[in-house]
């Protein structure tokens, strides 16, 4: 299965997907970034074609040209237009750093999520892989992984454990979709 990874940051989740593609039977065929970011260099080091663009027609054409079967949002900090969500329905997935529906929606990404979990005094958090729809973080849930929140935790320590769980859950889910 050919997948395109969309990323906006360091690309550590992209790297996990690259490292586990043989194990799970998918191929990272394209990286799409909406801005200059370290994920682009990671993709280039793995000989994966990259596209840095905010032009959704250009992005859609690249997806078609690379015979993409699944789009994986991995730290992609941009809203997907409704027409892309419709055209690629049930073929776009996202990894979110909480147990949705808790701590999801507009503005809930990265450390904002972990700070909200910590401030709420949650006993557990985790990550969710879900289908992408036009409404932020509201697509059908595919899988979740639970992470305990310890009394001694800070938002940073919560983030570290959730990110580690993401790097296990996301490749596995993609492998199950192959």
Regions found by a protein language model. Name each.
Residues 1-178:
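One-carbon transfer enzymes
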